[in-house]
């Protein structure tokens, strides 16, 4: 199993938290100190927690489980989509729609509509419509693809969520908690770790840090899938106990 090391995290700026006045006391035990009124995250605590999360994800992937990537803020979206696609994982990179997990039946109907429109666009149906109707359907297709394109092949609820910026994605975490879906999350010094089963204390804004998290997670999924033939399947019910306190 490949692991992230301290040098990788330092180069990516994982240790830089938020301004001290915005800190969340629940993250106090992961803070090393402050520099120029910026909290510094204790990477000696982050390192084993990050690697534990990667090991968990690799085991899930080995058991053919689905890990959904969630990162909808501007600095994360593109990286989330790229790495999820590389790992063949579902993702949400634009906006979390309320009920995406807890009302999946309705979401599935919207995914069917998206697939129908994709078929119509490809088979020439749009060309047979009036300009106005074709434009309306094209806009519907674009809107649905933007919202649901990353999960259209998911085929059911995910077995775990990996979240960048737990405050920004609090609705997703709440839905996962209600359904008993494990949550892995990058938690910065201004955020609450509540509802996160596998906490990764770290910078959730810097692009290089986000790239490190996403690339490492995608690599773990790919490794797990490649080891399916020689390993024992591991299911979500057998996951380790939550790390959150």
Swiss-Prot record:
Cross-referenced SUPFAM superfamilies: Ribosomal protein S2
Q: Which GO terms describe its biological process?
A: translation
Q: Which domain of life is it from?
A: Bacteria
| GO cellular component labels | cytosolic small ribosomal subunit
A molecular function (GO) held by this record is: structural constituent of ribosome
Coiled coil stretches, renumbered? none
Tell me which InterPro entries the record gives.
Answer: Ribosomal_uS2, Ribosomal_uS2_bac/mit/plastid, Ribosomal_uS2_CS, Ribosomal_uS2_flav_dom_sf
Q: What are the protein's UniProt keywords?
A: Ribonucleoprotein, Ribosomal protein
Q: Which family does it belong to?
A: Belongs to the universal ribosomal protein uS2 family.
Q: What's the protein called, per UniProt?
A: Small ribosomal subunit protein uS2
Q: Which organism is it from?
A: Pseudomonas putida (strain GB-1)
